[in-house]
Amino acid sequence: DQPVERHAENKRHLIPAVMRAMTMNADRRVQCCRIEFCDEDCGCCYH
């Protein structure tokens, strides 16, 4: 178990999480957010 091998495996598992976060951020720009999570990245609905 070499340090380089561990780093490559850790990085491989990180990439799906990063992709999910990026997808969530993109979705928030076009969808309504829950009011407690409202910020500049999402279009908030106040109805």
Curated annotation (Swiss-Prot):
Organism whose genome encodes this protein: Conus regius (Crown cone)
Keyword Protein biosynthesis attached: no
Family the entry assigns: Belongs to the conotoxin M superfamily.
Origin superkingdom: Eukaryota
Keyword flag Secreted: yes
Tissue: Expressed by the venom duct.
Keywords of the record: Disulfide bond, Secreted, Toxin
Chain positions listed as propeptide in the UniProt record: 1-31, 46-47
Name of protein: Conotoxin reg3.11
Comment block on domains: The cysteine framework is III (CC-C-C-CC).
GO molecular function, one term: toxin activity
